């Protein structure tokens, strides 16, 4: 049976605009709800769709980086967000940066101007009946957030990111770290970076002097959510971390048989073991200082940080428990979620989630099989990550090559390896396009 009704898309940000576009261009009818300017958020200032509230950069445009590959995949699928960004681009070296007013204006013009899109400017306070995509973003209104909490279960909806940095496993110096669990309980599941007292002192001093990201007004209470940044912990006294995430007890170094002065633990972050996260290292440091401090840790001197630690206001779901790789709710087949609230991190990633949700919401109305993008693609690897990650430790993730399955052939040089991964991803998306 084909479901003929319109699809309600809630939120005209990057994800909602992309979702509406993908539905409309396939012949589906969309009712696109946007509460601005009737009700503004603390971060937005206009009534335009896809308003960029932070940076005007959509990050790297080269196929040598993951987000560049993601953009190229989206170009293949006629993404309205990437189309508008390309048209509104300003000089930015190897990155794709935009004139933010021109960009938002173009997205608004394309989406509003499509004959299959009806725009409704009002706040949505309940999850709508019938086919719908919720794409209300990190600043979801309080009324709808309460409804989402009731729908998903209070323990599965979060209001703040507190993400520790994630490291590319290939860049960890295995000669300096060792595999062990505390007191040897269970399997040896952690990589341990041991520190001498002298190494710890240098690390501690750099950490407390490192520059942090200024908090915005609506983020002032962020640290009272039971999650303390590592630098705030350090500022409370030199030994505080030694009784917290850097506690060495039960982690004797097998090479020496002795207990180090301090230990930084790394925990495997994905099933293929290509990514490791830094246990207890949620941080509000700026990215430059964050990299410098992390590279002072033994074994991480040459670490590639695929996702930096962040702490900010962000309404997001525990997607491993709630969503399928199609961005479809496990609980309600006609309900989809898109954008940053699904646990993808970044402008482009949010739009990509909207693209998949839009395609699949339309397919649902046509009683067609929903599209699960190949994991070799950046689009598919993100969908796989947010739905298959460990639900207990789930935190938002941006596009990176550590998410895709390894190549069949080992390529040691990073540049050549990334080029091969990009080539495979784009070949895969081209083969997959006929299904979407």
From Swiss-Prot:
Reactions this protein catalyses: uridine(54) in tRNA + (6R)-5,10-methylene-5,6,7,8-tetrahydrofolate + NADH + H(+) = 5-methyluridine(54) in tRNA + (6S)-5,6,7,8-tetrahydrofolate + NAD(+); uridine(54) in tRNA + (6R)-5,10-methylene-5,6,7,8-tetrahydrofolate + NADPH + H(+) = 5-methyluridine(54) in tRNA + (6S)-5,6,7,8-tetrahydrofolate + NADP(+)
Keyword Transcription appears in the UniProt entry: no
Cellular localization per UniProt: Cytoplasm
Keywords: Cytoplasm, FAD, Flavoprotein, Methyltransferase, NAD, NADP, Transferase, tRNA processing
Alphabetized InterPro entries for the sequence: FAD/NAD-bd_sf, MnmG-rel, MnmG-rel_CS, MnmG_N, TrmFO
GO biological processes: tRNA methylation; tRNA wobble uridine modification
Manganese listed as a keyword: no
Main location: cytoplasm
Protein name stated in the entry: Methylenetetrahydrofolate--tRNA-(uracil-5-)-methyltransferase TrmFO
EC code(s) of this entry: 2.1.1.74
Similarity-based family: Belongs to the MnmG family. TrmFO subfamily.
Pfam families linked: GIDA
PANTHER family, A to Z: GLUCOSE INHIBITED DIVISION PROTEIN A, METHYLENETETRAHYDROFOLATE--TRNA-(URACIL-5-)-METHYLTRANSFERASE TRMFO
Superkingdom as given in the UniProt entry: Bacteria
S-S bonds: none
Gene source species: Shouchella clausii (strain KSM-K16)
